[in-house]
Amino acid sequence: GSFYIKGNNQKTKLCVEKKIRSQVRIVASRSHPSKMLDALLEEIGEYKIITKGSSLKFCLIAKGQADIYPRLGPTSEWDIAAGHAIVKFAGGSLLTIDRKSMQYNLTENNLNPYFVVASREDLALNAISLITWKEKYCYFYKKQKTVGN
């Protein structure tokens, strides 16, 4: 499991939030805005954005204080490996944008594909579906407008 230690040396087990909420809590980067994230937010319904830096986003999910972290920009393996382990052992999920488990040490440049971290795998899959559907729709729509002109 994943644990954190409070100031009084009390060890607490981390556990992701499994219950379905009416308002999805989405962790986003302060310094990496994304058009793909904006597209997801348009489709998701009621949500709350929580902005945090670096690996704290993973920790909020592992602690049950956030539901989804879509990372739709470049990262390196060393940026996410520890956070991935923390979320995984707290019961959460990290899937690449093509719905696969993240693999490490497969490329020379050590860059990750886009991914979604979530408290539940179904949330990650739903977010990925919305992101990829919206991306394909927008591409198709732009292409159709160009061809028609």
Model-flagged regions — what are they?
Residues 67-71, 93-96:
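Paired acidic/hydrophobic, glycine-rich loop segments that form the ligand-binding mouth/hinge
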Residues 26, 60-62, 82-88:
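Hydrophobic residues within well-ordered alpha-helices
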Residues 92-108:
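Acidic, metal-binding active-site segment of PIN/NYN-like and related structure-specific nucleases
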Residues 86, 105, 109-114:
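Short low-complexity, flexible loop/linker segments enriched in glycine and/or proline
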Residues 54, 72-73:
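Beta->alpha turn/N-cap motifs
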Residues 1-58, 110-149:
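Acidic beta-strand-loop-alpha-helix segment within the catalytic core
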Residues 30, 73-75, 97-100:
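Short secondary-structure boundary segments
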Residues 78:
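Acidic donor-binding loop at a coil-to-helix junction in glycosyltransferase catalytic cores
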